Amino acid sequence: MDHKNYLNHVIRGIYNDFQFLVDEGVVERSALDWVHANIHLQDGPASPVTAPAAQPVESSVPLPLPKRKSSVEKRAGSVASAVAAMSLSQNSGEKRTPEEPRKLPGVPAPQKQSEASSVNSSTEKLPPPPSYPGPNTAHKNVERVLAMYDFPGPDAGDLGFHAGEVIIVLEHVNNDWWRGELNGKEGIFPSNYVRLLEDSAVKAQPPPPPPQQNYPPAASSSAPPMQYQQTAYPPQQAPYPPVQAYPQAPQQPIVVAQPTEHKHSSTFKKIGSGLGSAFVFGAGATAGADLVNSIF
């Protein structure tokens, strides 16, 4: 980068810084108009300031840095502070006509003693710039990039790294500068110095399952069944023997006597009744004796 391109690079940074201060309400827009009216870009063809394309890792020649970092990282510099002080003094009623700085190649315009003291006193009265909110760390996805070249990180807030290191991307500040983390350190780095890894979209891991409580194992079904103590009962008495059925005596045929034989008929009746009584008494006595013997 030659001297003219470097001056244009610094002037563009001043424009960006003052635009940020105007948006935050620190200075009036008239100060920004004064900067545009009095600080011009250098004439002549200027090389493009866009970020160059990334080269393979094997190349040892580092790429030129892209355009100036975000205005959040680099606030108003020495030249911006001087112009802001002059703008504030004009708004407070103190009219001054700034002199046109001499355009010397490689040498900035010198400041007078009174102007330097005025700048110091005015900068002390300026309110501090608002703090830049930190990156949102609650990412569902994490981007990882691979460093293609060595980046020393010359400025405060830069994230230095070496070629081959893996960086976690926290925020895309703009198209040219990203914010990342490496070895516990956060900072910004040029996006054309790194290459996005294919497996960078790593989803957040689900929370681990709750610890399981250890319960005693259930009793196996093959265990022997529980034995119950049976109550001993007194032995039962032997059942009574069944009563033997004795065959009945065949019924005697009834003889019908003729009416003429009256005497024989009555005799046969007496004999038949006697035999029946004897049979009944004998059968009953035998059954009764057997029943008494079985009981005792």
Swiss-Prot record:
A GO CC term assigned to this protein in UniProt: cytoplasm
GO process annotations (BP): actin cytoskeleton organization; endocytosis
Compositional bias per record (Polar residues), positions renumbered to this chain: 111-124
Keywords: SH3 domain
Claim: Disulfide bond is one of the keywords in the record: no
Compositional bias segments (type: Basic and acidic residues): 93-103
Pro residues bias: start-end ranges: 205-214
Ranges of Low complexity composition bias in the record: 215-235
Database matches in SUPFAM superfamilies: SH3-domain (SSF50044)
Residue span(s) of domain SH3: 140-199
Chain intervals for the UniProt region annotation (Disordered): 46-138, 202-246
Name of protein: Protein csh3
Native source organism of the sequence: Schizosaccharomyces pombe (strain 972 / ATCC 24843)
